[in-house]
Regions:
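Hydrophobic pocket/interface hotspot
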Residues: 24-25, 34, 53-55, 78, ...
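Amphipathic alpha-helical segments
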Residues: 18-36
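Hydrophobic/aromatic beta-strand elements that line small-molecule binding cavities or substrate pockets
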Residues: 13-15, 73-80, 104-113
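A conserved amphipathic terminal alpha-helix motif
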Residues: 128-173
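Short beta-edge strand/loop motif at the mouth of beta-sheet-based domains
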Residues: 12, 32-73, 165-172
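A short, structured loop/turn motif at beta-sheet edges
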Residues: 21-22, 46-50, 79-86, 110-121
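Beta-strand/loop substructures that line and gate deep hydrophobic ligand-binding cavities in soluble
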Residues: 94-147
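Short acidic N-proximal helix/loop "leader" segments that mark the beginning
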Residues: 1-12
Length: 173
């Protein structure tokens, strides 16, 4: 992943998951998987270039002091996809239940086998060039959200969907 430009907002996370890279990446495109690990209520995610990628979360009971009510929709365009290795989303926007969208952003996800090939190292990088207060707050909320979501992804894939109940990725711990 290239280094961020000066003034850019970036979230970078990496995690190891005991499954294949293909299985990890497919969990970003299968509605049942997305519901299980990311808590989405609706998904239109097509794993091919120039196709839509849209996920929706139900509105939360929590209201952020800057962003308002959380939940809403994250939508963009699949620009590149490499089977079992990576995908890149561009023109990515977060639209909260109320208020103006935040975007455009980019999301890159990469997955590589490590060790004996039964474990995958997956990395995500979400980035944007804007730097206003609302953007900074969104990236702060999403940094925590990605931590919870990736933990849930690992639990979902390693435990075949049998995991303790978790609240929405938007809810505070």
């Amino acid at each position: 992943m290239p280094p961020p430009s000066e003034g850019a907002l970036v979230i970078e996370r990496a995690i190891q998951i005991r499954t294949s890279p293909g299985r990890v990446l497919s969990a970003f495109f299968q509605p049942r998987d997305l519901a299980a690990w990311w808590g989405v209520s609706n998904a239109v995610t097509v794993a091919r270039p120039l196709a839509p990628y849209a996920v929706q979360w139900p509105p939360t009971h929590y209201t952020d002091e800057v962003l308002g009510q959380l939940g809403g929709t994250l939508h963009g365009t699949v620009m590149d996809i490499r089977d079992g290795a990576s995908f890149f989303l561009a023109d990515l926007y977060y639209t909260p239940p109320e208020g103006a969208p935040i975007g455009p952003m980019a999301l890159e996800v990469e997955a590589h086998p490590i060790g004996d090939g039964r474990t995958t190292e997956m990395s995500i990088r979400q980035s944007a060039d804007d730097n206003g207060a609302r953007w900074q707050r969104y990236f702060g909320v999403m940094a925590e959200g990605w931590d919870r979501a990736l933990d849930a992804l690992r639990e979902h894939l390693e435990w075949a969907g049998v995991r303790p109940h978790r609240g929405s990725i938007w809810e505070r711990r």
